[in-house]
């Protein structure tokens, strides 16, 4: 089994918790949640800068696709990832 980067494991756990209470959301709300929870490295991204915004977007999408694959392996949830909406649903 693949071992995760320690940063990614923490992000996936926090995303799973967040989606448990907000099954339909968007990328901005996810990033703001990760920043509010001080999840590294999101706590250091400055969304007002192009580099910070890109880094937050890239890492958020990367983590969401890892979470989607995890949900598929566990046959637990489906995760729909669109440019303006993210939705978790029971299978």
Enumerate the language-model features and the residues they cover:
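Short "pre-J" leader segments immediately N-terminal to J/J-like domains in DnaJ-family
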Residues: 2-91
């Amino acid at each position: 089994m693949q071992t995760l980067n320690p940063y990614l494991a923490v992000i996936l756990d926090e995303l799973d918790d967040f989606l448990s209470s907000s099954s339909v959301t968007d990328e901005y709300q996810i990033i703001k949640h990760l920043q509010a929870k001080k999840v590294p490295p999101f706590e250091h991204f400055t969304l007002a800068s192009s580099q910070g915004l890109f880094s937050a977007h890239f890492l958020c999408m990367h983590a969401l696709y890892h979470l989607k694959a995890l949900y598929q392996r566990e046959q637990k949830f489906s995760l729909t990832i669109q440019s303006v909406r993210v939705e978790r649903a029971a299978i």
